Amino acid sequence: MPFFVNVKISKSVFRSFRLSFSSFQDFSVFFFNSFNCLHSMLKFVNLDSKSQFKSLVESNSFMKDFFWLVSSSILSLNDSLICLRDLICSFLASLEDCNFLHSTNKFSLSSKVKFISFDEFAVSTPLWELLPANSGSTSFVSLLLKILEIENRFVLSPSSPLPHSSAFKLAILVTPFVETLSWLNELSMLFAYCPAELSLSLFFLCLLLWDIFERLVESLDRCVFTRLYSTLWSY
């Protein structure tokens, strides 16, 4: 079964690898060959033995270069997402200034919405220690719930007839994909046994995406357009 990957590379990411690859074609060949190699390893490597996988990665210079590439790409993506997060914050602040939010449920960005500080999570805990011991289709969801436990944000709003938190909405969006797409589960298990450097970069990426998603959900829940949509939906 072929393994297709759609890749979008920003200019900042490409500049960081310009010295390592003579041309973009060489970079793309290396990237897609790496994913094909990963897909093949999913079939032959026993994922129940993480020591076997780690030793295989450490002994293979090609795989070590690949994991360095992925880690650097994620860190570059984090920088882009931080800029996006600041842009979202400015947009929400402009909504407050224009009174687009509920007058009764108006919230303060500085008091109720907190940026994630990576310093609080700069620990040497590998990602596989956060995952449950048993493997299954819920491993990815369990990882998200573990992040929620660390962030202490899994709180349902008692004033809403339905669960109001972004955690509930994210679970609704993610769970069907995790249960139906087997390759996503395999890929999440594969990254769970990656070296600690890559695991931490993936973990920080999840936290940053979570921060952006939570901001959007909290703003939309209090936005007048959502109120109008709810009124029309009731009819």
Swiss-Prot record:
Q: Look up and give the membrane topology term.
A: Multi-pass membrane protein
State the phenotype upon gene disruption. Cannot grow under anaerobic growth conditions.
So where does this one cross the membrane? 167-187, 190-210
Cellular localisation: Membrane
Q: Which UniProt keywords apply?
A: Membrane, Transmembrane, Transmembrane helix
Q: Which GO terms describe its cellular component?
A: membrane
> Additional comments on file?
Partially overlaps NUM1. Disruption phenotypes caused by deletion of this gene may also be a result of a defect in its overlapping gene.
What is the protein name for this chain? Putative uncharacterized membrane protein YDR149C
Origin organism is Saccharomyces cerevisiae (strain ATCC 204508 / S288c)
